[in-house]
Amino acid sequence: MPHNYHLFDFLDFDPDLSRDESLWKAYKPTSVYEKDGDICINVPFQKQVLSNDMAPDTTSPREEYTLVIRQYTSGITRLFIGFGEESMTDQSEMLQFSDRVKKLPLQVTQTEGEWLITTQDGIQRALIHVKPPVLDRWSELLPDPQETLDLRLYPDGKREIRLAAYDHFSPPRYDALPLAFCKRNGVKERATLSFESKPDECFAGTGERFAKMDLSGQTFFLKNQDGQGVNNRRTYKNIPFYLSSRMYGTFYHTCAHSKLSLAGQSTRSVQFLSDQAMLDVFVIAGDTMEEILRGYRDLTGYPSMPPLWSFGIWMSRMTYFSADEVNEICDRMRAEHYPCDVIHLDTGWFKTDWLCEWKFNEERFPDPKGFIQGLKKKGYRVSLWQLPYVAENAEQIDEARKNDYIAPLTKKQDSEGSNFSALDYAGTIDFTYPKATEWYKGLLKNLLDMGVTCIKTDFGENIHMDALYKGMKPELLNNLYALLYQKAAYEITKDVTGDGIVWARSAWAGCQRYPLHWGGDSCSSWDGMAGSLKGGLHFGLSGFAFWSHDVPGFHTLPNFMNSIVDDDVYMRWTQFGVFSSHIRYHGTNKREPWHYPAIAPMIKKWWKLRYTLIPYIVEQSRKAIASGAPLLQALIFHHPEDKLCWHIDDEYYFGNDFLVAPVMNSENRRDVYLPEGKWVNFFTGERLEGGRWLKNLDVPLDEMPVYVRQGATIPVYPDEVECTDDMDLSKSIGLHIDPHFKGIFKN
C-alpha cells in the first residue's frame, strides 16, 4: 500500500499512478554566476521513476532551471525559481516593501567543494556544497544516493537554515525533497521545497490556526474556506508564513493552494508544496520574535491605526430588524450607563433578511440617513453587514451580469459556506476587474455618505471556482480574494469617512494592512472560547496587530440559534474581550447585558474598565503599527527560549505590560504560569515573582487572573464616559504599578 510514503502522502500523486504525472528532483548545481547583485544557480532536475523506491528515470533528459538568491537588509534572504514563464517580481498585491528593505549585492567565491555566497561586507549569506558525500564503500546492496541540492542559508549572517538535502531512509526511500517540481500531462503544475528541522524545534503562525501553540508535527492545507467554527482544521485565515523556535520565519510568496508540513510528514523537515510551478520564498532571521515579524511586515506591509472609537464596545446580534429596535437598545444602554461606541446591523437591514442589496429596507428603516445621524448624536457609530456575492434575485443582478461585475459561471455550484438562507448566490464580485471594484465601491459609498462608519466584510473565503475572472484563474484568486475584497472596502471607507477600518473574517498575506479582523463563528462554550484564543495567538504571530472575536461566542449548542448562553460563559468571555484589541458582542441570539440580570452589574463594571484602559490600548496600538508586535501576544513572543511557553496557549500578553489568563471553566479555577520577571496582580495588588506556576487559583467570577509588570506605568482615563466622544486622551493619567498600588478597583 502507498500510504505514508512521500510521493503519495505529501506530493499528492495518485496511488494507482494511472495519471500522466511525473516528478523532477533537483540535482547538484552545474554552475553559478552573479547578475545585478543576485546569485544565479543553474540547477538540473532529473525525472524520477514513480514508486515507493524513487530512482532516476534516465529515459528522459534532465531539465535545467535557474535558482536565484537575493539578499535584503533586515536579515532577509529570498529564493526564487520558476519552472515556467514566471519571473521574480516585487509587483504583487501581497508585497508592500518598506523603506527598511534594501537589496544587498551578493558575490560568490567558488572552491573545489563549495560555493560561498557573501555580501560585500564579507558576511556569509549562503553556502552550496557541490562535493559528493564521502563514502566508505563496502556494500552494493542499495544504490548510491542521487545527486542533491545541498544549500545552506544565513539570512542574518548567523543562523543556518538548510535545505533538506538528505531526508531519506535509504537512497530510494525519500521522506522529503530539497527542491522538486511535478508535471501532469506534460505541464508543470506544482513545486516543493523543504528545509531541515531539528528534533526540539517548535513552530507557530500560519494564520488564525485553531491549534495548540507548538504546531510541530502538523500538516496544513493553505486554502481559505469557511471555518464553520473555531475547533477544527478549517480556517478563515491562512497565512503562508511560520515562525520557528530557531529564530527564523519563512514567508512563501504565493496565493496558490498549498500544503505546509511543519515536521509532520517527516520530523526532519519543514515541507512546502505549492499548486503553482514556481517558488518565491523569503527567509527572515532575527534575535527576537518581534524582529522576525517586523521583517515580515517590511515585506508585506504594516497595519494602519484604527480610529479611536473602534477601541470602544461594539454591540450586535444576528440581527436587529428595524430602526425602532436599534434606537430602543441604544437608548437603554445610555439610560443604564453602559458605555458603548458602535451598533452593528447584521443581516436584517435589507428588504429581505440575508438578501444583500446594499440598501436599507424602506419600511423598517424609513429614514436611514436621519437614523444614522441620530445615533451619531448619541455617540454611536453604525457598522453594516454585507458580503461579496450577488444573489440571483438581488436588484443588481442584471447590471452585474451585463458588465461582468460578477465573474460569469461556467457551471452551477452549490454553496460551501455558512449562510443561513436559501439564497442562490449567482456570482462572486470580480475584484480582479477594476470596473467591478469601482462598482462595488460605489455601492458602499452610498452607505458611507449616509454616515455609516464601518463595513463588515463578511465571508470572502470561498469564491465560485467554476467562473471566469478577468485577471486571474480562480485557483490563484481563492486565497488572494480576501485581500482584494478588504482593500476595496477599506479604501472607500477611508476616502469617505477619513477612518480606515473594516470588520473582516477572511485573510491572506497582506491583509494586516487593512484592519481589523475577527475570529469567525465560534461556539458560545468553553471550547469555543479556548479555540478563539488559540486562533488569535497564532494570528498575531502571522503579522497581524489587531484581532477580535464574538463575545460570548457566535452560535449556541445544541440548538445553533436558540440555546441560551450560560452566565459564566458570558462573563468570562467579556473579560477576555476587555483585554483584546477590539471587543464586539455578537451572536445568533440576544447579547445585550440586561438579558443576563444576575451578572449585568459585573458586566457594566468590566465595560467601564475597558474605557479606563483605552489610553493604554491606544499607546500599545501605536507601538504595534510601527513594529512587529501584535496587541495579543503569545508568551513565546517575549520568551521564545522558555520551552514551557511553547506549550501555553491559554495565556497571553496584552501589549507589553499585561499578562492575561482567562478562566475557561465553570469551576472558577485555573493554573497560571508566570514568566520570568516581577509581577503584580492587577486586581489585588499582590506582588509575585515570575518563573513559576501558580496552581489551582480560585478566581471569583468578577475577577480574572491579570498581572502587570512591576514598575510599569499604565496610561488610563480617569473619568467615566459614555463613549469615546467624551474622551480627551490628553487628560489621561499614569497608573504607577509601585508599592502603593493596591489593585485597579481599590486605588
Each model region followed by its residue ranges:
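Aromatic- and carboxylate-enriched substrate-binding clefts and catalytic-loop regions
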Residues: 82-84, 144, 156, 173, ...
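Residue-level recognition of beta-strand termini and adjacent short loop/turns
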Residues: 35, 71-75
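Generic recognition of flexible, low-complexity loop/linker segments
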Residues: 55-56, 66-67, 227-230, 237-239, ...
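Beta-strand-rich binding/interaction modules
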Residues: 65, 79-80, 90, 95, ...
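Catalytic and substrate-binding clefts that recognize carbohydrates or anionic sugar/phosphate headgroups
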Residues: 2-17, 22, 45-50, 58-61, ...
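An acidic- and aromatic-residue-enriched active-site/binding cleft used to recognize and process polar
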Residues: 74, 82-84, 113, 120-124, ...
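Catalytic core of carbohydrate-active enzymes
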Residues: 490-495, 499-500, 507-518, 528-531, ...
